[in-house]
From Swiss-Prot:
Domain of life: Eukaryota
Subcellular location(s) of the protein: Endoplasmic reticulum membrane
Gene this protein is translated from: Fads3
Organism: Rattus norvegicus (Rat)
Name used for this protein in its record: Fatty acid desaturase 3
Its biological purpose: Mammals have different sphingoid bases that differ in their length and/or pattern of desaturation and hydroxyl groups. The predominant sphingoid base that comprises mammalian ceramides is sphing-4-enine (sphingosine or SPH) which has a trans (E) desaturation at carbon 4. FADS3 is a desaturase that introduces a cis (Z) double bond between carbon 14 and carbon 15 of the sphingoid base (also known as long chain base, LCB), producing LCBs such as sphinga-4,14-dienine (SPD, d18:2(4E,14Z)) from SPH. Prefers SPH-containing ceramides (N-acylsphing-4-enines) as substrates.
Transmembrane segments: 138-158, 164-184, 269-289, 311-331
Amino acid sequence: MGGVGEPGGGPGPREGPAPLGAPLPIFRWEQIRQHDLPGDKWLVIERRVYDISRWAQRHPGGSRLIGHHSAEDATDAFHAFHQDLHFVRKFLKPLLIGELAPEEPSQDGAQNAQLIEDFRALRQAAEDMKLFEADTTFFALLLGHILAMELLAWLLVYLLGPGWVSSVLAALILAISQAQCWCLQHDLGHASIFPKSRWNHVAQQFVMGQLKGFSAHWWNFRHFQHHAKPNIFHKDPDVTVAPVFLLGESSVEYGKKKRRYLPYNHQHLYFFLIGPPLLTLVNFEVENLAYMLVCMQWTDLLWAASFYSRFFLSYSPFYGATGTLLLFVAVRVLESHWFVWITQMNHIPKEIGHEKHRDWASSQLAATCNVEPSLFIDWFSGHLNFQIEHHLFPTMPRHNYRRVAPLVKAFCAKHGLHYEVKPFLTALVDIIGSLKKSGDIWLDAYLHQ
């Protein structure tokens, strides 16, 4: 009989796609684990083995995103990220090189097979309840109230003149509008509004580009990695913030290596100076522009240019060039505070470290928590207070998170997974507490290890 990796007693594992109709080679996990190298990457989906080494560069989500799942069972990630599985499976066919040996488990390592099976049943139940179908009226109203705020801000300045009161009110209204734009483009980026991915991405380019001045491709490049491997160093861009801030396991590592680029034991204090005020205004603006130029995203660049043109044409007649620039900076700083506090309250206080190769549900729950819902918090946070549900089901429209939450709670209770829900203010305070704890750990390791 043929050995593992040999369809019928051949000399070894077959490289390249399996010929149509030929018996598929079989592989063990110990073989698959060897293919997690630059230029040599395999992954497993529904027990079938795919060689993505060359194709990864053409992956619509980016080579880094799909590469984060190399040498792993990517079945649940595959289902989580894609709407039309029948369509995307066509791209898998040429990459198929074999399947897992019959005696091999579907997942590598010490993963809980019953937990994984129950999570897939949970997803199927959500699909049967039609929780992945969007209410387009809900999202139309969201877009409408964003546009209404843009108009209201301009009318305030137009009718009252560019005085302090009208200018401050306009800046606040524009900042709220920009914050809600983040939420709406986030929905579109996850393809959770329209039935076709293409429609979502075209609409996202409009919202992200014309209404915000950023690149939709840049956002997706960053954000999809965050969803694939939340709170994992070198895979989640949101926690790759050293040497400015130390989070999770990096605190001990920097301390032991005697690295002191900043007074990390005071990072919970300087966070207020360079975190919330500057993330959107400085870091995102620079990173976004660099991405569009380096990756030659000219369409996104034109969309972004249309935002800046509209903004300056709208307000320069009242403020002049310098005053309009100051208004823009004020809006960016205000929205930056919203962005940092709202997006990080669910993640920074949670487990942050190196890859542990958990199953999809366990990895998401280890890195996320919820915030107590209310009509205001749901709106203000763009439903990111339901971060657990969002991370488990990224393509689910956010207006259905409340409906799926009881099913998720029951699933977590059955398997002993921590379904954490915090009051809003507690979640915000925990960000500072987490930064202080990491700084203290760094100082102890720096002085004593």
